[in-house]
């Protein structure tokens, strides 16, 4: 057997051992995590756009514009929530909305009664104060009102009582007015959320928010 044949046979049996660097198989390629669908991404973008448009506005000094900002925030929240949570919040909001409107009507009645009390107390206080001021002008009135008679005691008692009622009713009416404003804002938020949850989208939610005018901005 020739030397060339021996070398050829040796190379055939040891071909796998000729590699300088051993072969390493590539790692297993895992599938990518699922991402949000196109419509969900558009809803998220629209939600952030609406919220940014509302928060970046310089208006909102009056109560109506504050309610409008709260409505913008509720609508952005509805667009951001998943569909099951959106429907749950919608049904709960419809039930809460009825009770809030009943509470609002009750607070408005109490506020109207307090305004009448304030008006009557103010009129009586003004009348008794004017009667006390007349004592400076007329000496006869001064003698009648500064004596120990029933007229003097009645006028001073009414003045003190109506002044106290005027101050107390004013503080209570201010608190009720704050509660009315807060309840109206809550109603606006719930109504906006329910309206946004009830909307049917055609799939194209890419709205150019630069063209949307908010308030006076």
Swiss-Prot record:
InterPro entries in the record: Orbi_NS3
Pfam families per record: Orbi_NS3
Parts forming coiled coils = none
Q: What does this protein do?
A: May play a role in the release of virions from infected cells.
Q: Which family does it belong to?
A: Belongs to the orbivirus NS3 family.
For this entry, the protein name equals Non-structural protein NS3
Gene name in the database record: Segment-10
């Amino acid at each position: 057997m020739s030397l060339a044949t021996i070398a050829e046979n040796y190379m055939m049996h040891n071909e796998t051992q000729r590699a300088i660097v051993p072969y390493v198989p590539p790692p297993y390629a895992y599938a990518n995590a699922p991402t949000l669908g196109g419509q969900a991404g558009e809803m998220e973008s629209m939600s952030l756009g609406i919220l940014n448009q509302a928060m970046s506005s310089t208006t909102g000094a009056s109560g109506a514009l504050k309610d409008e900002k709260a409505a913008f925030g509720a609508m952005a929240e509805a667009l951001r929530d998943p569909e099951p949570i959106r429907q749950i919040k919608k049904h709960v909001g419809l039930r809460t909305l009825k009770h809030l409107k009943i509470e609002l009507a009750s607070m408005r009645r109490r506020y109207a009664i307090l305004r009448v009390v304030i008006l009557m107390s103010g009129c009586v206080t003004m009348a008794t104060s004017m009667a006390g001021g007349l004592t400076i002008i007329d000496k006869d009135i001064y003698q009648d009102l500064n004596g120990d008679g029933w007229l003097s005691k009645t006028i001073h008692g009414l003045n003190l009582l109506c002044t106290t009622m005027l101050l107390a009713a004013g503080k209570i009416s201010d608190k009720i007015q704050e509660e009315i404003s807060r309840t109206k804002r809550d109603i606006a938020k719930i109504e906006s959320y329910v309206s946004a949850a009830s909307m049917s989208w055609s799939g194209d939610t890419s709205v150019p928010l630069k063209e949307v005018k908010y308030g006076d901005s």
